[in-house]
UniProtKB/Swiss-Prot annotation:
Species classification: Bacteria, Pseudomonadati, Pseudomonadota, Gammaproteobacteria, Alteromonadales
Encoding gene, per UniProt annotation: rimO
Protein name, entry field: Ribosomal protein uS12 methylthiotransferase RimO
Domain TRAM: 401-467
Positions of the Radical SAM core domain: 161-398
Binding site for [4Fe-4S] cluster 1: C42, C78, C107
Task of the protein: Catalyzes the methylthiolation of an aspartic acid residue of ribosomal protein uS12.
Keywords: 4Fe-4S, Cytoplasm, Iron, Iron-sulfur, Metal-binding, S-adenosyl-L-methionine, Transferase
Cofactor binding note of this UniProt entry: Binds 2 [4Fe-4S] clusters. One cluster is coordinated with 3 cysteines and an exchangeable S-adenosyl-L-methionine.
Top-level division of the source organism's lineage: Bacteria
Occurrences of domain MTTase N-terminal (ranges): 33-143
InterPro entries noted in UniProt: Elp3/MiaA/NifB-like_rSAM, Methylthiotransferase, Methylthiotransferase_CS, Methylthiotransferase_N, Methylthiotransferase_N_sf, NA-bd_OB-fold, Ribosomal_uS12_MeSTrfase_RimO, rSAM
The reaction(s) this protein catalyses: L-aspartate(89)-[ribosomal protein uS12]-hydrogen + (sulfur carrier)-SH + AH2 + 2 S-adenosyl-L-methionine = 3-methylsulfanyl-L-aspartate(89)-[ribosomal protein uS12]-hydrogen + (sulfur carrier)-H + 5'-deoxyadenosine + L-methionine + A + S-adenosyl-L-homocysteine + 2 H(+)
Cofactor: [4Fe-4S] cluster
GO biological process: tRNA modification
């Protein structure tokens, strides 16, 4: 959707990993050592799940979609906001009731006491990106099977829980910022960037396997390499600078769509826009702004010069007219007055952002923001949320209407009896809109087609294929 709020959901269930592995490895040898897996939360957590599942398969374990058939269940949790914590605890409860042997990992795992208080019978608890610890615990309770690793047929890219034509590429862990509404640094630690060579190796394998779109994710993507102290890495026999602009430039040469998510508004974001104008990476900028009132931004410990942000948006659009800007905002932050909220609405009117997500402030356990000002009532938060949504829906409809009559590349995600469903450069999977191509039932997921946009609303586009020559 173009304008959305947080709706907690399981990213993957017991069923998804099993089907993914079955499709990738139909000739795998049955070992009898079966693991169930539930993954919750954001794309960064999904990447962690993929890594754990890959190593489990390398070690010879099967992944099952049945609690009854599993020797043990792993639940990879989310702990970002209270709704996510509740969902994670519910998933652990279900796994305990249906199976009884459960290992908990992920962000909520960093709060072991909180989990033990509710579910004292879980076998083991680890924090986020504790891959080795998770596998060690699995080996303890379900002995590593004897098997020939060459019969597992694990793809070179590892296990992926996304469709074959797109994949998330995580470039770092942790975050050095200390936003008062966020507890991620306490869960995942400070910034820890992956070596550039390792990232580019993974990206190359993904593209060679048929991935058409690489979605770059981390807690703070634009900070990539700040912790490297200016040191270069090597890839393909050549030195590579370890900063987000250099990394994006290299990724853009690989022949796939490259989409950047979670860009903190640092000054050097300006350097990414020419790469978008040149077509090296998608002209799509996911840049969470959170608010527009200088007073609230200061309380959030976020950049507070809204005038500079508006100037930057204008400058970016002059350099790259096709630029699509996605952002997220929080309404009902502690101490937010009606005047503060009106400043936010005025900012939306002037900025004319393309894609916007809205969150009603949630009291995250351990967040500094809970104690810095008077909490806003649920009634006021709900009212401001709906006013925000109503305004942004009008803006989104206006921004999408500019595509009508244009011919765009559309990446097909799904095909049903009514036609094909895809996305343009303006649409990230799951969070943005879709492009509906009615009647085109012969297309297949992963195809890239040229289509003329015929209609739009505040969320989605409709199109007709104009070029029968497709690429897959």
């Amino acid at each position: 959707m173009t304008v959305e709020t947080f709706k907690p959901k399981q990213t993957t269930t017991l069923d998804t990993p099993a089907k993914t592995l079955e499709a990738a490895s139909t000739n795998a040898v049955t070992t009898g050592n079966r693991i169930g897996f539930v993954s919750l939360g954001c794309p960064k957590n999904l990447v962690d799940s993929e890594r754990i599942l890959t190593q489990l398969r390398i070690d010879g374990y099967e992944v099952t979609n049945s609690y009854d058939n599993a020797d043990l269940v792993i639940v990879n949790t989310c702990g970002f906001i209270d709704a996510a914590v509740e969902e994670s605890l519910d998933a652990v409860r279900e796994a305990l009731e249906e199976n009884g042997k459960v290992i908990v990992t992920g962000c909520l795992g960093a709060k072991e006491n909180q989990i033990r208080e509710v579910h004292p019978d879980v076998l083991e608890i680890t924090g986020p990106h504790s891959y080795e610890a998770v596998l060690k615990h699995v080996h303890k309770y379900v002995p590593k099977p004897e098997h020939n690793p060459f019969t597992s047929l694990i793809p070179q890219t590892g296990v992926k829980l996304t469709p074959k034509h797109y994949a998330y590429l995580k470039i770092s862990e942790g975050c050095d910022n200390r936003c008062t509404f966020c507890i991620i640094p306490s869960l995942r630690g400070d910034l820890d960037s992956r070596p550039a060579g390792s990232i580019l190796d993974e990206a190359k394998r993904l593209v060679e396997s048929g991935v058409q779109e690489i979605l770059v994710v981390s807690q703070d993507t634009s900070a990539y390499g700040k912790d490297k102290g200016g040191r270069t890495d090597f890839w393909d026999g050549m030195p590579v600078k370890q900063d987000i602009t250099s990394l994006a430039r290299q990724l853009g040469k690989m022949g796939a769509w490259v989409r950047l998510h979670y860009i903190y508004p640092y000054p050097w974001v300006d350097d990414l826009i020419p790469l978008m104008a040149e077509g090296l990476i998608l002209p799509y900028l996911d840049i969470p702004m959170q608010h527009a009132s200088p007073r609230i931004l200061k309380m959030m410990k976020r950049p507070g010069r809204v005038d500079r942000q508006l100037e930057a948006i204008q400058r970016w659009r002059e350099i790259c007219p096709d630029l699509v800007i996605r952002s997220t905002f929080i309404v009902g932050f502690p101490g937010e007055t009606e005047e503060d909220f009106q400043i936010l609405l005025d900012f939306l009117k002037e900025a004319r952002l393309d894609r916007v997500g809205c969150f009603k402030y949630s009291e995250v356990d351990g967040a500094v923001a809970n104690t810095i000002a008077e909490l806003i009532s649920e009634e006021v938060k709900e009212d401001r949320y709906h006013r925000f949504m109503e305004l942004q829906a009008e803006i989104s409809a206006e921004r999408l209407a500019r595509f009508v009559g244009r011919t765009l590349d559309i990446l097909i995600d799904d095909v049903d009896e009514e036609g094909a469903i895809g996305r343009s450069f303006a649409d990230a999977p799951e969070i943005d809109g879709m492009v509906f191509i009615n009647g085109e039932t012969e297309l297949e997921p992963g195809m890239l087609v040229r289509a003329r946009i015929t209609h739009s609303d505040e969320h989605d586009l409709w199109a007709e294929v104009v070029d029968a020559d497709t690429q897959d």
